[in-house]
């Protein structure tokens, strides 16, 4: 029995924040079953990973893509378990072309100006004979690179595709490893006007009611779509990236220890979809925004999470991945996922201007700006505005 390591290796997001006025013409599309299934899976996986304390960041689209390629080579009950766990459509005969179509849509205009989005796949052959039809399928539908190599070749591919942000993904490979399936997402988004560094000040971030850390907090005042839900005790803010194709969605509980109170917003795909729709139709309001400057790095062995979600046979010697090599001698030994997120003031050349505003006395002023003070734990998503695909999601509990 040979094995193969499924390395869902890297989801990198170098997100450089700045302010941009959102447009009111966000393009809407009919949500397809693949997007809905991917969102449902993202929230299931989040529920598994969130049990650990601390910060959390991962790319559900990266995980779904890599396992989508693996699913294409699964057969019988192994395939059924993968389909159910990943929330793929019950009729998955068109899954590969649907993934191709969705990825192409996500990449459309993805590298225009200061926005960069790369989604890349690969199959590294270490010792196995792989079916030509499987390799052809990966090339045709996932635009996968196919090459032979060892752990050094794999790590070099990782370093190249992530622009050096992740120098390695694996320390070693078992001599029984047959092949490694790879997926990487690299994202760099900036805004037209960055946060001014002069307005970044060290201030408390409250980890709990009794504990806090002093961290750099960025500040700006601008118009953004904002929802204040007093009944469920949270605020949600949508920060569009330049080009208005991708957005950063923040969900901030009113209470410092209130992350559980916003659970209903992310308990299933329908509830999250409803919130995203509300955000995209919410009128822009003047917002005084305070956001921590931070960097997140995550490294997950996802096998335990998938087993808890009901996927078992794929990790056993009885697994059926005969669609990959024509035999029943492959099983998954490892699912490794790394993710990096950077948020700071940089991302574009900045210009400065000074305005001296002379006001007449007794002029009726507009309403004061709303406050969005992200000085305690919050949830966040990086999503595509048109398809509502979740590229990245996470939880910030300590930016220090």
Give the label of every model feature segment.
Residues 5, 60, 253-256, 290-292, ...:
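Proline-rich low-complexity regions
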Residues 269-272:
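Well-ordered, non-membrane alpha-helical segments in soluble/globular domains
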Residues 334-400:
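C-terminal soluble interaction/assembly domains
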Residues 1-12, 16-148, 385, 396:
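Detector for small/aliphatic-rich hydrophobic stretches
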């Amino acid at each position: 029995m040979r094995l193969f390591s499924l390395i869902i290796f890297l989801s990198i997001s170098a997100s450089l924040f700045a302010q941009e006025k959102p447009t009111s013409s966000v393009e809407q599309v009919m949500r397809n079953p693949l997007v809905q299934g991917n969102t449902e899976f993202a929230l299931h996986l989040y529920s598994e990973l969130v049990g650990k304390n601390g910060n959390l960041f991962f790319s559900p689209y990266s995980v779904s893509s890599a396992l989508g390629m693996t699913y294409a080579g699964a057969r019988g009950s192994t395939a059924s378990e993968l389909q159910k766990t990943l929330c793929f459509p019950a009729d998955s005969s068109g899954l590969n072309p649907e993934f191709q179509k969705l990825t192409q849509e996500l990449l459309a205009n993805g590298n225009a100006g200061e926005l960069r989005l790369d989604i890349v796949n690969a199959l590294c052959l270490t010792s196995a004979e792989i079916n030509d039809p499987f390799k052809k399928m990966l090339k045709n539908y996932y635009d996968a690179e196919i090459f032979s190599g060892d752990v050094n070749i794999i790590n070099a591919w990782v370093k190249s595709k992530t622009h050096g942000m992740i120098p390695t993904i694996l320390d070693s490979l078992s001599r029984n490893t047959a092949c490694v399936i790879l997926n990487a997402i690299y994202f760099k988004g900036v805004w037209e006007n960055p946060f001014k560094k002069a307005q970044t000040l060290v201030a408390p971030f409250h980890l709990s009611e009794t504990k806090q850390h002093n961290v750099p907090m960025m500040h700006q005042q601008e118009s953004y779509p904002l929802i204040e839900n007093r009944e469920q005790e949270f605020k949600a803010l949508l920060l569009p990236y330049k080009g208005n194709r991708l957005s950063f969605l923040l969900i901030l509980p009113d209470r410092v220890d209130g992350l559980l109170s916003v659970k209903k917003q992310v308990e299933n795909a329908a509830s999250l979809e409803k919130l995203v729709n509300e955000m995209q139709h919410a009128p822009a309001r003047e917002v005084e925004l305070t956001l921590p400057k931070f960097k997140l790095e995550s490294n997950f062995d996802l096998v335990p999470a998938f087993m808890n979600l009901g996927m078992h046979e794929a990790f056993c010697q009885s697994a059926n991945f005969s669609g990959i090599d024509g035999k029943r001698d492959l099983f998954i030994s490892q699912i490794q996922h790394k993710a990096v997120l950077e948020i700071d003031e940089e991302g574009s050349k900045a210009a400065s201007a000074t305005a001296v505003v002379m006001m007449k006395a007794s002029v009726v002023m507009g309403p004061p700006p709303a406050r969005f003070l992200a000085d305690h734990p919050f949830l966040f998503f990086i999503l595509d505005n048109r398809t509502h695909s979740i590229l990245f999601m996470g939880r910030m509990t300590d930016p220090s």
